[in-house]
UniProtKB/Swiss-Prot annotation:
It comes from Pseudomonas syringae pv. syringae (strain B728a). InterPro entries: DUF480, WH-like_DNA-bd_sf, WH_DNA-bd_sf. Belongs to the UPF0502 family. It holds the Pfam family DUF480. Transmembrane segments: none annotated. This is UPF0502 protein Psyr_2419.
Length: 224
């Protein structure tokens, strides 16, 4: 399947969407931390590197350096997708996805999840967003996903052999990266053949581990 996007609504600048893997990860992390840890947001460079290299709730797991993250932040800033916030103790970074891509809060959260974890089902997005946005049900998730698709920011990936549900993926990466991501997910089997309740429990445990990692990172940075 090729990556194609059609838009019935106004679309953001195409150049702004040609993001590499590091830029995709940075935006996803900034969106996530704004929603789950507002008291430490915007993020320092050190905190953002830790978030990017987090072992849970990330697909794929990455090992980025401060130099890589810093360079990508500047590139994103030039596209209007991040902003440097000067501070008395440390400079911090925030995303501008809502303004740069003209998204409402629900769409920002879904975009962040897709940036962090690749193609996902509606139920996965509903479960994983519970700490970030109050979606009443899966229909609300689908409605916002359809609006992202109409903007050319996401696409529906029909279920493949061995999969039970369709998936949705973002279209913010460069074409080559998106094709690689799509190919990898199409070849992957359904995540566990466990029940929805079991998968929900796994997501809950991942969220708890992520929260512990965030707390540890804050303690370490406080000692710097």
């Amino acid at each position: 399947m090729s990556i194609e996007s059609s838009s019935t609504e106004s679309s953001p600048n195409t150049e702004a969407l040609q993001l590499n893997g590091t830029e995709v990860r940075i935006l996803g992390c900034l969106i996530e931390k704004q929603a789950t840890n507002p008291e430490t947001y915007p993020l320092t460079l050190n905190a953002l590197v830790t978030a990017c290299n987090q072992k849970t709730s990330r697909d794929p797991v990455m090992n980025l350096t401060q130099g890589q993250v810093g360079q990508s932040l500047r590139a994103l800033e030039g596209r209007g997708l991040t902003r440097l916030v000067m501070g008395s103790r440390a400079d911090r970074w925030e995303h501008r996805v809502d303004k740069g891509l003209e998204l409402v809060p629900a769409q920002v959260i879904l975009t962040g999840l897709l940036l962090l974890r690749g193609p996902q089902t509606v139920n996965e997005l509903l479960t994983r967003s519970n700490r970030m946005h109050d979606f009443e049900d899966s229909e609300q998730v689908v409605h916002q996903l359809e609006r992202l698709i109409a903007r050319g920011l996401a696409m529906l990936v029909p279920r493949q052999s061995g999969q039970r549900e369709d998936r949705y993926m973002h279209l913010l990466g460069d074409p080559e990266s998106l094709q690689e991501l799509l190919a990898a997910r199409q070849q992957a089997p359904e995540r566990h053949s466990a029940s929805p309740a079991a998968n929900s429990r796994i997501d809950e445990l991942e969220a708890r581990v992520a929260a512990l990692e965030e707390r540890l990172a804050r303690l370490e940075h406080a000692e710097e």
